[in-house]
Amino acid sequence: MSYSTSQIRNVALAGHPGAGKTTLFEALLHAGGALQTAGSIERGSTVSDFDPIEKERGHSLDAAIASTDHLASSGQQIHLNLIDTPGYPDFRGPALGALAAVETVAIVVDADIGIAHGTRRMLEYAKQ
């Protein structure tokens, strides 16, 4: 299916390590129908953490992109390009590259720890 630019949204998920970016990525893809079942970090079955080292360590090393469709409240079909970004500072390069490619950054905050240092850093980068 082809989409007009007005129907496309490019969204990066960013935040502190372990905040839930990959889990949200999986849930959004599942809700949009792109995945039959949302993957799990614990099971090593996520779409975005496909590298064996990512599965072993339980966190993202690189940014990953996947797409799904969403019916907006206006009735317009929206095509979402979602980018799951790594949270650890050692892998911040791919996250910053993703921020440059999107018009929207969703900052994911861990409800247990609140706004952490990595959250603040990514928020500042997103503002640039």
What are these regions (language model features)?
Residues G114-Q128:
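Amphipathic helical hotspot of TIR/SEFIR-family domains
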Residues M1-L96, A100-A101, V105-V109, I113-I115:
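P-loop NTPase switch module centered on the Walker A-proximal segment
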